[in-house]
Amino acid sequence: PIISVPYSISNVIGFNFANMTLIVYVVFVIIEMILHTIWQFVDKSANQLGMYLLRDVLQIPVSIIFTRFLNIFSGMIPSVNNNMPVQIMLLIIAVILTGIGAAMSLNMRIIPNPGDGIVQAISDTTKLNKRKGKGVGFCKNCFDITNVTITFIIGLSTGHFLLGLGVGTILAMIGVGRVIAVFNNLFMDKMNKIAFDYVE
């Protein structure tokens, strides 16, 4: 769902999709840095601003690599437009693996892509982070809904209506956040115990 925003903009203005995604991701990183800086001054216990900002900035090289691969592979992925069962199966697998991957990288504080990083930043800097990992899943759902709404508005205002939106986008909007929430509920304490020797 996050990628639907740069996709719709790139189609409307005729700009390269991967480059538009990079621009949107850099905007996300800037927002993350602002959120973490404000959080530092509001919550005095949040005393690792330098580490948070470093993780935020390092998302830009990750974005550059990701969007270059997006350019390379977007034309190489085979189409399954005429095979609905295969489409549904691939969608379900993609939603589950995306949710698990996002949860694991965010929980372990590995440098995420900015789409996940901004969700983590919102969760970190709000009361949602008190919900034992469930806040990230809820934030993901809210952020995905916001992006789908923005995409819908872009399409509607430019006469393209459902540009960048489909059944897969809607199911991913709901599913990825729920997978993160379920995964964190089942495994977050175990991961924290193994990696950081603490349990929330």
Give the ranges of each region predicted by the language model.
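Core subunits and conserved enzymes of cellular information-processing
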Residues: P1-E200
